[in-house]
């Protein structure tokens, strides 16, 4: 019976590892969304977005004030690794106008949407916001 319990736990861990990828303490994970494929998310599985306005501005922060209330920035807590296992792309940080450091992915600041819950992607291609898809 104990061996069966251990096997069940190992299988559950393997399934979880195949659907999310992150280094311990990493600010983001990768998870599989039925509609959008592999997307970046917070460790609580809240989808991450970039804003086309900032992409066109060469990565400069444009989402401040009421924009940042609706689209909360993903702030860096400590060092952010440039690479994360299982995620093709480069991470970094950018200094926001308020002086705080925000996480970037491939040079673009990344945000959550305040009105989404875990595993929801409600605002892809809405007003220039796009979920961050990864390989």
Question: What is each stretch, according to the model?
Answer:
Residues 1-8:
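Bacterial N-terminal signal peptides that target proteins for export
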Residues 4, 22-135:
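Compact beta-sheet-dominated domain cores in extracellular/mature segments
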Residues 14-22:
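C-terminal segment of classical bacterial N-terminal signal peptides
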